[in-house]
Amino acid sequence: ATVWGIYPKKDVPTSGNVFTFTLGDATQSAQKAELQNTMHMLAKGTVNGTTVTNLKFEHLTALYQFKFTNRRPDAYKVTKVVVSADAAIFPKTLTVSGEEKTYGDKSNSLTLSMTSLDMAKNEVAYGYLSFFPMADMTKDTELTFTATIEKVGDSSSTETIEKKGKISELYNAESVVAGDEYKYVAGKRYGIAFMLVADLGYEETEAGKYLVKKEDGLINLASEPTVMTNAATVITLDADLDMSTKEAWVPVTEFKGILDGNGK
């Protein structure tokens, strides 16, 4: 006799050895991956008396892992990520009958909504989204990953970060995707990284050397203890700075004296 194993368990009995699984847009709270209801698996085994043998589960879904890194001075939160394509390559249903898999209710996008996914400066956060991989994808399939973020405590600061390109552009030749002929495969995880970068007003031209481009750049550098306490740090201006409007830089008293520029 044949026995079937299904994960996660179904409350409604399945008849005729035909199994239907559903996926759609997902919601994640904080950094807890809500995968227990979306990582669908199916197994077929044999019953010998009271023993079940050869029961091996097959993954039916693949997984996006979104990595967010906040390099901005303020705390930010991610509210959602949308994966979209020109073609409808994201099915919401999968029906398995014997060796045959049939995908239905295809869409050109999937959405992961997130609550309480906050990141302080330099913190990293992750989001997870399960999906049914299809054979329709090729190296020329264009995908767009759009993350919506906002500053913590300021709902009016909403903005988006976008990563877009052909599959062959988003994943290099050494990637798992390239090894699978630029197709997503069930049971595998695919990483997509987003970086929240701020215009700090300065750039590090080489180790320990900084070029300040505007007033905020000098203020931001001054707030970096590892930079300011390093005797080898060299800070150069590429323009005159007017600090008179910067409250954080108003001197408590007037300075008078001679500045020793080391002869330069």
Locations of regions flagged by a protein language model:
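Short, low-hydrophobicity acidic/polar segments
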Residues: A1-K77, E123-Y128, P133, T146-G153, ...
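Short, surface-exposed beta-strand/loop "edge" segments at domain boundaries and coil↔beta transitions
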Residues: D11-N17, D74-A75, A88-K92, T138-K139, ...
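Conserved SET/PR-domain catalytic core that frames the SAM/AdoMet-binding pocket
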Residues: L60-P73, V82, D216, F255-G263
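Extended low-complexity, serine/threonine- and proline-enriched intrinsically disordered segments
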Residues: Y76-Y103, A147-I149
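Extended serine/threonine-enriched, polar tracts that run as long, contiguous segments within proteins
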Residues: V83-S84, L112-E162
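Solvent-exposed serine/threonine-rich low-complexity stretches and specific carbohydrate-binding patches
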Residues: K92-A120, K164-E169
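Surface-exposed repetitive/solenoidal architectures
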Residues: D199-K264
